Amino acid sequence: MSRFVTSVSALAMLALAPAALSSGAYANDKLVELSKSDDNWVMPGKNYDSNNFSDLKQINKGNVKQLRPAWTFSTGLLNGHEGAPLVVDGKMYIHTSFPNNTFALGLDDPGTILWQDKPKQNPAARAVACCDLVNRGLAYWPGDGKTPALILKTQLDGNVAALNAETGETVWKVENSDIKVGSTLTIAPYVVKDKVIIGSSGAELGVRGYLTAYDVKTGEQVWRAYATGPDKDLLLASDFNIKNPHYGQKGLGTGTWEGDAWKIGGGTNWGWYAYDPGTNLIYFGTGNPAPWNETMRPGDNKWTMTIFGRDADTGEAKFGYQKTPHDEWDYAGVNVMMLSEQKDKDGKARKLLTHPDRNGIVYTLDRTDGALVSANKLDDTVNVFKSVDLKTGQPVRDPEYGTRMDHLAKDICPSAMGYHNQGHDSYDPKRELFFMGINHICMDWEPFMLPYRAGQFFVGATLNMYPGPKGDRQNYEGLGQIKAYNAITGDYKWEKMERFAVWGGTMATAGDLVFYGTLDGYLKARDSDTGDLLWKFKIPSGAIGYPMTYTHKGTQYVAIYYGVGGWPGVGLVFDLADPTAGLGAVGAFKKLANYTQMGGGVVVFSLDGKGPYDDPNVGEWKSAAK
């Protein structure tokens, strides 16, 4: 693996090891402190709980109708813009789709670009990217007095870079993924202590998934844990799943595969993370096995489709719960992990993790040991599973919707897109409600055999997608929902239909509001208690990212990326017409181009459009000549 790293010598690093540990702890404390400030949005999900919730309430359900654009910024790129910007100490950091440019703006005058990073990438990465050329965001590390504050980014060509947050200069760069075998990067980096955590992409090309921790200051690899293979590669702790041995323990990363199929077995993780400083565990999900054709890979295919809790320092897995053994539908299990502290049905206080999965089930686990607390359908139209057995953790399949070679499965709900995909959802701790964006889409599935060839798609299925039973199948609308969910009772307080899938996710605030963007190009605000639509605004292109909020000089702002794309937008972006193209997405979203077109940028809102340009001097040119 080639890598360019600017750092001190290995000998000096050994001498500095004790200091590095203390400086890492300092930096992590500083990051936690920044995440608690309403002025900032310093990481995906806002904080380590990954709940996309803000205590801000200057904008509330009583005045949200007064929201107006305060300013905008165009990224100059037209592919899908997922994730959200970061705001740290008066600066906004903006990322883009390929070629993964980064911009820093000062919030006093966002019309002036403080710095920009436009990396030179291997264009071959475009050909092996699965589902548009998206990227899910940036990470911030606050520095430790010796190393400056950093912006961490991933590139589609598999590189990870650390930029000086003040100047944009590259501090280090390292190759994480090999595009020659189809391994790319779309994930947002995740900073914990003195490490930056990086996932992987490419399961559709047979890439074996892994999670890597790098020293945030130098780019040196600290540990790497695989999703499949021998226990030593998986970094299974000696007490792995000790509280839940029925989930499986040792030897299964190879023993649940035929021969060496695990070597090209997928399980990449390109979604979202959460972290609990109390348990020191990083929580994330692994993706689908490869190929999609289930006949070609007998067995449970562990540990794809798994929620892992891994020690942040060592990478060791303390627990792993496989949600969909022997996945048959591409239900990649990488979706958002949201942390909460609630009382269970018996009144016992629990530290919980809630995860809405692509397979149509929303799971809640005890995040200290992985014990399953609840597992409920995201919608009553889910038909691949009848239920989940809480004692064994196993889903109860309906064989009618299996995808074996001797059976042409029709009207499978959910589709391969899942009833939930990469959208980053929110949790309101006062209401104990999760606000989730849903893809209400079903499919027909026709499997076929194919050989593995490195760097080529390794799928083995033709898909046709269309609206779910609650949608309009004649007009191909009603493909999405917004829902308010209680993880303890399993009840949905309210749900609202949308024209298209709600792909980007939601943000909740103490102003009794839930914000989200839509594929047809609206930013919307709903009442947290009732789901009533209180406000909407037409933005320049469809939204596949999630909203964020911050304050600057006493004013609350709400920001969202515009830029349709991602898997739902591949037909529009690449001008495709075959309904089975785009791995089935083109047919489902055949009407999308009637409502929006490509774009790329950020729109920032405030009450009455108040902002930096209320000052007539901001943004004006002044001659230096006397």
From Swiss-Prot:
Cofactor comment text: Binds 1 PQQ group per subunit. PQQ is inserted between disulfide Cys-130-Cys-131 and the indole ring of Trp-270.
Keywords: Calcium, Cell inner membrane, Cell membrane, Disulfide bond, Membrane, Metal-binding, Methanol utilization, Oxidoreductase, PQQ, Signal
Binding site for Ca(2+): E204, N288
Active site, renumbered: D330 (proton acceptor)
Membrane topology: Peripheral membrane protein
A single GO BP: methanol metabolic process
Entry GO MF terms: alcohol dehydrogenase (cytochrome c(L)) activity; calcium ion binding
Subcellular locations according to the entry: Cell inner membrane
Pfam families per record: PQQ
Entry EC number(s): 1.1.2.7
Task of the protein: Catalyzes the oxidation of primary alcohols including methanol.
Similarity remark: Belongs to the bacterial PQQ dehydrogenase family.
The protein's name: Methanol dehydrogenase [cytochrome c] subunit 1
Organism: Methylorubrum extorquens (strain ATCC 14718 / DSM 1338 / JCM 2805 / NCIMB 9133 / AM1) (Methylobacterium extorquens)
